[in-house]
UniProtKB/Swiss-Prot annotation:
The keyword Membrane applies. It comes from the Eukaryota. It is a multi-pass membrane protein. It is found in: Membrane. This is Serpentine receptor class alpha-4. One of its GO terms (biological process) is detection of chemical stimulus involved in sensory perception.
Length: 329
């Protein structure tokens, strides 16, 4: 007896809808943008970075999580698009069992979790750079590595917990959908991601303001003042990243909460008409390397411009000191 289960008519209708096809094509754009900008972001992080070595470890971990999500998401998106365009006239479109999708889903969810936890890890490392005295290279490297490993471990633990005791006896069209018995936990996960993104945003603002407030309490010695300026620049970059991440996660979790709460009073077609556009993690993943690349390049260009002004302008000693002070603002 065949154990194959075929897609229902409603699922096939969703696959062949113009809304679905447009969404699947558009969502591949941020996926490929992520791959391209990750390459350039890693290059500028290595060569022109405003970040310490410990922060670089965490940035690499964030790049890894973002690209892990995008690779797995792209595979399933292309597969669904292929089915939508070329296989819907077949007598049976076989569904996958939840059990055979288990490992794929766990790795996929760990990519999403890694993007959120990675931001928290970056802030924790920035807090260490701010409040720990003598935060020199060896100490910062150990801190960065410890936080990176912890983030990766927590990411995979989270994905396992979501489907911990799920019987996985159902069927689904794609391996990036949560099993039917784990839907409630997936909703909790979405809410936690949003709250954690909000926490990251508030924390990053507080750390940035603290460093800005005490910037000039550091004696005007090039080494200490430069490190203080480095902390301010890197923290403001992370602050901007967390703001973008929070907005996307708010749309993701709040949007799904609303449509799930009214699912009983709207049709299957209308539910998925909206749902396909509410999944924002591909855009979160794409924004990360883009913003890192932009912020590092703009900071580097600003420093070069200031140096050129120093070297090309004749000044008195007092004017030179004042200009140097302004450069650190």
């Amino acid at each position: 007896m065949s154990l194959t289960k075929c897609a229902s008519k409603l699922e096939i209708d969703r696959l062949i809808s113009l809304n679905f096809r447009i969404n699947q094509i558009i969502v591949l754009i941020p996926v490929f943008i992520t791959f391209i900008f990750t390459y350039y972001a890693i290059k500028v992080v290595q060569k022109k970075s405003i970040f310490e070595l410990s922060t670089k470890f965490l940035l690499i971990q964030n790049f890894f999580s973002a690209n892990l999500h995008q690779v797995l998401y792209a595979i399933e998106t292309i597969r669904r698009l292929h089915i939508s365009l070329f296989e819907t006239n077949q007598p049976c479109i076989p569904l996958k069992t939840e059990f055979e999708c288990r490992l794929y889903l766990e790795v996929f969810v760990s990519g999403v979790a890694g993007m959120v936890y990675g931001q928290t890890g970056l802030l924790l490392e920035r807090a260490c750079a701010t409040f720990i005295k003598n935060y020199e290279e060896k100490k910062s490297v150990r801190t960065g590595l410890a936080i990176s490993v912890s983030v990766l471990c927590l990411s995979f633990i989270t994905s396992r917990l979501i489907i911990w005791d799920d019987p996985l006896d159902g069927y689904q069209l794609t391996c990036i959908s949560f099993p039917s018995d784990s839907v409630d936990r997936s909703s909790y996960f979405q809410s936690i991601c949003t709250l954690l993104a909000l926490f990251n945003l508030v924390t990053s603002i507080l750390i940035w303001k603290y460093n800005k407030k005490f910037e000039y309490s550091t004696p005007f010695v090039v080494g200490p003042r430069f490190r203080k300026r480095e902390v301010i620049d890197s923290t403001s970059t992370i602050c901007f990243l967390t703001f973008v991440q929070f907005i996307f996660f708010l749309v993701y979790s709040l949007g799904f909460f609303i449509i799930k709460s009214i699912r009983e009073i709207i049709s299957y077609e209308n539910y998925y008409l909206v749902a396909v556009w509410l999944y924002t993690p591909p855009y979160i993943a794409a924004s990360f390397p883009i913003l890192i690349f932009y912020r590092i390049r703009s900071s580097y260009a600003n420093r070069v411009l200031i140096i050129k002004k120093f070297t090309n302008t004749k000044q008195t000693i007092e004017e030179h000191i004042q200009q140097m002070k302004n450069a650190w603002k």
